[in-house]
């Protein structure tokens, strides 16, 4: 099961879907308010809302089945939360630069972004944030796509989805709260990230012997788009070994 990130949609996985669909039962989700999914009223875009949607989807459409849940960015945190809440539904988690394991210093930056989203134009704020997380090698067409997509989304979705990932009671993306969530996971986890300090910090958090954390240089936040073939090879090899 593939879960995209904040302001994304299932098309983010277009470079993975042909291979994954040829090897596995594959479900690519548009999260609420994103892509072709229903736009919910304001106040309905907290992490627990997204987790509840995926839990209901599996229970209704795939009862009794387990998934390897692959999440990018916000989707990585949703995958981890679902695995903690319903390990009977999740056999493993792949987090591609997931919203997990950030330092308290980064948490302060994210808090400022959440404030800017609340008081400013969320499409502009999101686009400015994206510019900070690309690699020099990132294709300009990807940058344009990400920016235009965010600017075309409902403002409430963009504003309300970001902050609770990193700020306030119940956040699980920063500091000790993120460590607590990750340490609670009993399923194998493969976390791919770009920051070597984050990779070192997170490695001791996962108890399953098949878990691992890798640092991926020469890629921006959308690692699976910047290094398509490498990610496909690494993720499928890990899934097959699990």
Label every PLM stretch briefly.
Residues 49-66:
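Conserved acidic catalytic loop of the alpha/beta-hydrolase fold
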């Amino acid at each position: 099961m593939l879960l995209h990130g904040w302001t994304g949609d299932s098309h983010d996985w277009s470079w993975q879907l042909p291979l994954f669909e040829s090897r596995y039962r594959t479900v690519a989700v548009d999260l609420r308010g994103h892509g072709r999914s229903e736009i919910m009223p304001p106040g309905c875009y907290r992490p627990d809302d997204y987790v509840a949607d995926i839990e209901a989807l599996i229970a209704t459409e795939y009862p009794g089945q387990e998934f390897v849940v692959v999440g990018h960015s916000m989707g990585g945190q949703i995958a981890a939360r679902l695995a903690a809440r319903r390990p009977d539904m999740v056999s493993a988690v792949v987090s591609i630069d997931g919203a997990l394991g950030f330092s308290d210093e980064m948490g302060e930056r994210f808090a400022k972004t959440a404030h800017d989203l609340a008081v400013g134009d969320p499409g502009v704020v999101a686009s400015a944030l994206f510019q900070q997380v690309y690699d020099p090698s990132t294709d300009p067409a990807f940058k344009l796509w990400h920016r235009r997509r965010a600017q075309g989304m409902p403002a409430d979705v963009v504003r309300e989805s970001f902050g609770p990932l990193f700020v306030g009671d119940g956040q699980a993306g920063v500091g000790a709260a993120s460590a607590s969530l990750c340490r609670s996971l009993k399923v194998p986890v493969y976390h791919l990230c770009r920051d070597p300090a984050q990779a070192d910090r997170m490695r001791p958090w996962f108890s399953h012997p098949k878990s691992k954390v890798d640092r991926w240089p020469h890629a921006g936040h959308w690692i699976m788009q910047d290094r398509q073939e490498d990610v496909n090879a690494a993720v499928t090899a890990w899934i097959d070994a699990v």
